[in-house]
């Protein structure tokens, strides 16, 4: 009877809820004040969404498409705030309000879900100390336990991540493209959390982190480097992510033979640093629009999804634990890529540089938009 009831329940779930049954949290890669005011964000929560991510591009889009920020823009400008400070105040307000909306999920899941992410300024991507200072300021200003500060997984970002975790600040490590960068982020989390535990400042179980591993951008770059209609096109992004997930299990999952340096923390109730699949909107219209969700679903993961892709997944996605199989195939595909002369190391190195620039450009565009809006509103 229990089995029949279980099957009936699963049958009646939507795809987002089915993802949860497979161990994956679905987060929304979008935030705006209009979503908060209109109740749209609450509707996503009712579908089963359990978190939100943001970046400068998302805030730029929100400012461009709505007048809901106008009153605050005028108020902060009258206070004499510069455009960087104005943006930070607007972002802090939205993230704090979103965190309050997700707080019941955070409480219900014992700190393991219900997070809202905000990014440090992209211009600090190569500055360790500047990143630490800004992350501390954002953490204090928002003052919510279910917030994550996004820090890029650059060479300068990795030591910042370790320091922030050691202070009990939740971190979303972003712009991860390579297995090596992912591994560095995971060890920074473990080392920082070990320091936090030894400091006696609090329980390790209260600190959370995700490692945002980008997917579709890898396929776009690899596809451009391959001969036309090559059999590896559209496969390397997923293969790369699967190998990163294998590394995650090697580092954190004791039941699969891993978890060495993490195990002492695990015994205190510490959370694993979950892989978060980012850049999961399909860039090539020839590919299935939910492929990066369907193929990368499995235990202890998060997928942050743009609104359009979320709608597609809810309509015709195919949730299942596909992430737990296909490692030999992924390794074979990576080997075949090298054999045709395409270096995944070069691809991911260039993607990190381009990713930092893209976010920095979006940040500059956002600041320019604030200037233009103020010129009109004054």
Language model: regions and residue ranges:
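Catalytic beta/alpha-barrel core
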Residues: 29, 145-154, 169-181
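Glycine-enriched alpha-helix->loop->beta-strand junction motifs that scaffold or abut catalytic
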Residues: 48-50, 143, 160-171, 206
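N- or domain-start disorder-to-order transition segments that initiate the globular core
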Residues: 2-39
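Conserved, mostly hydrophobic/aromatic
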Residues: 55, 118, 149, 164, ...
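Catalytic alpha/beta core domains of metabolic enzymes, predominantly
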Residues: 169-308
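Flexible, acidic glycine-rich loops studded with aromatic residues
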Residues: 270-377
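Active-site beta->alpha loop and helix N-cap motifs at the rims of alpha/beta catalytic domains
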Residues: 58-60, 65-160
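Active-site-adjacent beta->alpha loops and helix N-cap segments on the catalytic face
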Residues: 35, 127-133, 151-165, 178-192
């Amino acid at each position: 009877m229990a089995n029949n009831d279980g099957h009936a329940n699963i049958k009646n779930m939507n795809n987002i809820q089915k993802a949860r049954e497979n161990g994956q949290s679905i987060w929304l890669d979008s935030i705006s004040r209009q979503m908060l005011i209109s109740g749209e964000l609450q509707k996503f929560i009712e579908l089963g969404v359990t978190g939100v991510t943001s970046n400068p591009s998302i805030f730029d889009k929100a400012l461009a498409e709505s007048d809901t920020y106008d009153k605050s823009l005028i108020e902060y400008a009258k206070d004499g705030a510069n455009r960087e400070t104005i943006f930070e105040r607007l972002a802090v307000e939205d993230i704090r309000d979103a965190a309050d909306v997700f707080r019941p999920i955070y409480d219900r899941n014992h700190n393991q879900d219900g997070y809202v992410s905000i990014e440090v300024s992209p211009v600090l991507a190569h500055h360790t100390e500047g990143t630490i200072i800004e992350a501390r300021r954002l953490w204090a200003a928002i003052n919510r336990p279910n917030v994550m500060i996004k820090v890029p997984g650059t060479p300068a970002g990795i030591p910042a991540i370790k320091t922030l975790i050691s202070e009990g600040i939740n971190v979303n490590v972003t712009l991860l493209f390579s297995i090596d960068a992912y591994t560095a982020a995971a060890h920074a989390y473990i080392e920082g959390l070990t320091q936090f535990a030894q400091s006696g400042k609090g329980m390790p179980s209260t600190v959370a982190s995700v490692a945002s591993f980008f997917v579709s951008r890898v396929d776009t770059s690899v596809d451009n480097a391959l001969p036309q209609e090559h059999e590896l096109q559209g496969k390397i992004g997923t293969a790369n992510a699967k190998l990163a997930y294998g590394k995650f299990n090697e580092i954190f999952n004791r039941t699969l033979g891993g978890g060495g340096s993490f195990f002492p923390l695990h015994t205190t109730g510490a959370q694993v640093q979950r892989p978060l699949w980012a850049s999961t909107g399909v860039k090539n219209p020839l590919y299935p629009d939910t492929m990066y969700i369907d193929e990368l679903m499995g235990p202890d993961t998060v997928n942050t999804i743009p609104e359009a892709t979320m709608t597609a997944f809810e309509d015709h996605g195919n949730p299942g634990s596909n992430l737990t199989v296909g490692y030999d195939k992924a390794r074979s595909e990576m080997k075949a890529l090298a054999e045709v002369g395409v270096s995944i190391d070069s691809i991911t190195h260039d993607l990190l540089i381009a990713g930092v620039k893209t976010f920095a450009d979006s940040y500059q565009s956002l600041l320019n938009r604030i200037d233009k809006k103020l010129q009109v509103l004054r």
